[in-house]
């Protein structure tokens, strides 16, 4: 399975990981200096869940993001699936 949420469209993002040295000014130091920068990826918080669909009258096994799970609690599974289909996820 991919790392993309089928209900919200969340997918991995790219960013940087910074290596720093020095003592922070807050701690009476001269300040922090960046000594290196490495590419990294930020992954969405994915969860595999079995959810009951009342329309299809069966369980659906979905790998969804944690924010999609909160959205399902708030709106209901059928509304979230309809919304995802209309947005093209």
From Swiss-Prot:
Biological-process GO terms, alphabetical: translation
Record flagged with keyword ATP-binding: no
GO molecular function, one term: structural constituent of ribosome
GO CC list: ribonucleoprotein complex; ribosome
Superkingdom, natural source: Bacteria
UniProt cross-references to InterPro entries, sorted A to Z: Ribosomal_bL28 (IPR026569), Ribosomal_bL28/bL31-like_sf (IPR034704), Ribosomal_bL28_bact-type (IPR001383), Ribosomal_bL28_sf (IPR037147)
Presence of the UniProt keyword Ribonucleoprotein in the record: yes
Alphabetically ordered keywords of this record: Ribonucleoprotein, Ribosomal protein
UniProt family annotation: Belongs to the bacterial ribosomal protein bL28 family.
Name the UniProt record assigns to this protein: Large ribosomal subunit protein bL28
Gene: rpmB
């Amino acid at each position: 399975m991919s790392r993309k949420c089928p209900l919200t469209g969340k997918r991995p993002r790219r960013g940087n990981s910074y290596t720093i040295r020095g003592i922070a000014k807050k701690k009476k130091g001269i300040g922090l200096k960046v000594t290196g920068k490495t590419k990294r990826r930020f992954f969405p918080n994915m969860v595999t869940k079995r959810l009951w669909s009342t329309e299809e009258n069966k369980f659906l096994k979905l790998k969804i993001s944690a924010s999609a799970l909160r959205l399902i609690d708030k709106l209901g599974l059928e509304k979230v699936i309809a919304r995802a289909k209309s947005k093209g996820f």
